[in-house]
């Protein structure tokens, strides 16, 4: 009777061991993975959905302005001396409106951003502060004309003197709130013959930074008004219900799956990556070396490179940052050749030097983007200034910390600087003596750090995963011990052969029949 029970115990233990091995190697990981996928996919029933639709905390949107301190000297050919003023801090609220779902596991949506000035974070700075900056809209207009039809530059400049108020030089004295959101008024009601041409082109092109004035006679120029309280998109994004590895991937923007701003080149025109707010979980066995995001402001995808594994809020994270190869010149990265567009100067091939991005094909204005203070850009850009430009990795790089299990962004900052060329044009009085060079207007810092409430949710999830992992291996250990005990019990009961205790005897493996003639000594 005892033997029967022993054999039953052994059989049950063996089955439990097999089941435990299967669960440990495949079952538990699959169950956990499925549950995570269920929670983070973009679905009405998921934990992530409402947080994705309406981000539960404001992002930070900081603006730093380059104030010109030696205007008269620059007007007479001296190097510019700049003073960075900022941050002018804003709270940025984001809300998505779902437009519909596609059959290919996608969701279409628009994104609305709302900016509210944060006086506490801005300290002593005020939106009523007056600064002197490069006249961005004037330089954009005069450069466009000078590149397309140099012979009429002087005539058009006469019209621009009526279009812009007090146009004595290429610098704008302006309140911060007008430069950012409220707008600087420009007048189309003058009597210059070329003014109608200028205003007609503005009405036809409708650049984002120019919005029609209510009086019907002009426009308001501002850098960010088009971003505030307006719907951008629509975007079409993968929901991750069918393939979690594709979660967040943008497959179309404004109905286009390919950005033709850069011609027909597949490398430059493809939409690659997410909108930087959501990423798929990271496979620890195949950690991506690059993290792509689609940036509508520059009409292209950019990537951050993996630096390594780190820690944030006592949780493991992968740290990515913009590296020099992402902003490399054509000579350093031949693949970037398709971003070359002639616009920086009349004699330039449009293949910009290291560290700067051409925005002309994207914004229909000769603007140039870079990292703040020309970080990671060619040092020759720094030689143009007499002071005020000092690139610093800690202050000026773009980076992101990604939690691998859920793909949640623990902390991230996107930094971008807007520049335009200040060009010496002898036929234009305002530009006849100025030195030619790339001139920064301002830079932005946009990002977020998770609030304590969401950090606690993540920590609780990690704790629960730890318990599941412990149970996984505990069950396997118990099954192994039970199987070993039952095997020993069966062996001792004589139901299974065991290793002989006599040191002079031979193993039963080699001698299954100890009494046979094979083992006799002759």
From Swiss-Prot:
Pfam families: CD36 (PF01130). The chain crosses the membrane at residues 8-28, 470-490. Disulfide bonds join 268-338, 299-362, 340-351. One of its GO terms (biological process) is sensory perception of smell. GO terms for molecular function: scavenger receptor activity. InterPro entries: CD36_fam. It is found in: Cell membrane. Residues 1-7, 491-522 are cytoplasmic. Belongs to the CD36 family. PANTHER family: SCAVENGER RECEPTOR CLASS B TYPE-1 SR-B1, SENSORY NEURON MEMBRANE PROTEIN 1. Plays an olfactory role that is not restricted to pheromone sensitivity. This is Sensory neuron membrane protein 2. It comes from Ostrinia nubilalis.
